[in-house]
Curated annotation (Swiss-Prot):
Origin organism lineage: Bacteria, Pseudomonadati, Pseudomonadota, Alphaproteobacteria, Caulobacterales
InterPro entries per the UniProt record, alphabetical: ATP-grasp, ATP-grasp_succ-CoA_synth-type, ATP_grasp_subdomain_1, Succ-CoA_synthase_bsu_CS, SUCC_ACL_C, Succ_CoA_ligase-like_bsu, Succinyl-CoA_synth-like
Binding site for Mg(2+): 209, 223
Protein keywords: ATP-binding, Ligase, Magnesium, Metal-binding, Nucleotide-binding, Tricarboxylic acid cycle
Cofactor note: Binds 1 Mg(2+) ion per subunit.
Domain ATP-grasp, residue spans: 9-254
Catalytic activity as recorded in UniProt: succinate + ATP + CoA = succinyl-CoA + ADP + phosphate; GTP + succinate + CoA = succinyl-CoA + GDP + phosphate
Record-level Gene Ontology MF annotations: ATP binding; magnesium ion binding; succinate-CoA ligase (ADP-forming) activity; succinate-CoA ligase (GDP-forming) activity
Species per Swiss-Prot/TrEMBL record: Phenylobacterium zucineum (strain HLK1)
Record function comment: Succinyl-CoA synthetase functions in the citric acid cycle (TCA), coupling the hydrolysis of succinyl-CoA to the synthesis of either ATP or GTP and thus represents the only step of substrate-level phosphorylation in the TCA. The beta subunit provides nucleotide specificity of the enzyme and binds the substrate succinate, while the binding sites for coenzyme A and phosphate are found in the alpha subunit.
Assembly notes: Heterotetramer of two alpha and two beta subunits.
Sites where the protein binds substrate: 274, 331-333
Functional pathway: Carbohydrate metabolism; tricarboxylic acid cycle; succinate from succinyl-CoA (ligase route): step 1/1
Protein name: Succinate--CoA ligase [ADP-forming] subunit beta
Amino acid sequence: MNIHEHQAKAVLAEFGVAVPRGYPAFSVDEAVQAAEKLGGPVFVVKSQIHAGGRGKGRFEGLGPDAKGGVRVVKSVDEVKANAEEMLGRVLVTHQTGAAGKQVNRLYIEEGAQIAKEFYLSLLVDRETSWVSVVASTEGGMDIEEVAHATPEKIVTFSIDPATGVFPHHGRHLAKALGLTGGLAKEAATLLNQLYAAFLAKDMSMLEINPLIVTGDDHLRVLDAKVSFDSNALFRHADVVALRDESEEDPKEIEASKYDLSYIALDGEIGCMVNGAGLAMATMDIIKLYGAEPANFLDVGGGASKEKVTAAFKIITADPNVKGILVNIFGGIMRCDIIAEGVVAAVKEVGLKVPLVVRLEGTNVDLGKKIINESGLNVIAANDLSDGAEKIVKAVRGAA
């Protein structure tokens, strides 16, 4: 689960992390009130969306010379004018895709004197189950660009959760960022604070870009991005309260109600599969045959008829879907349950695109019988390769 920048900073502040003063604003009036509280002389008006690249983004409906989603201004009147221009508009960045995201809230923050910029992040290393710390002197840039152009400027080290942060970790971070004296001590303190927040809130990623040295020689978090482990939300009611569903895909929200693992993609072939590994293999083979998957959807091993019906409805709700491939290898998941769910969903919502079904495993004969006797126009597949080839051919033929 992702949250907005202003929420991330509020969470970090609970652990003593130094962040600039600021206030969220959901209207122009609230933006003006926030600026008046801050007092100036410099304000930063920040669009709040769940995507990076806001500063370099562009607003739909504004000219090519218009400013991006993060603007530095020097008066309350300028805060008001920019808030009027930004709120309600769609901001397009390199992470949002062409559709962009509508800006429904702003963050009005005090300006800061920037002497240096750094990059710092914490994330889970899934190979070791340790917490990886990634640091770079190249702050304010996309870390992917830094990794590609100057990988030697990125330093990574890991922290064992069994022992936590030791003094040498703080020294390692300070050295990586070229900090000495008081700033080196602040870096060590900051690492302890961030690590404490990371563990206490079950974060999966904590990214600070940039971490700055201010004009008066102190470290301060200028931007923060936080993602939480969705599997741990049951023990964090305070984190769940921060969720902004307007930033999420409605289909993904619906899928979460049925405990379905669903991720929307940009392709044209919808997929319904049991098992994450098989789902990824299914997407790969669709691409192998020259098409693109419209989603990742894992119904899991113990899906009910109702769950399968919901999954099928979610797939068909995507207007980009031109065909559907159901690929089930029945182990715990019975093929007859899948068949009943597909038949029920098609009878309820109709079938306007080609449907290819590949069933194998537990109760496969019963599953095939249910589909064959349903009267539905379903294309049967013998195996995964056959299924992918048939759905791609059917979609291309219908185009």
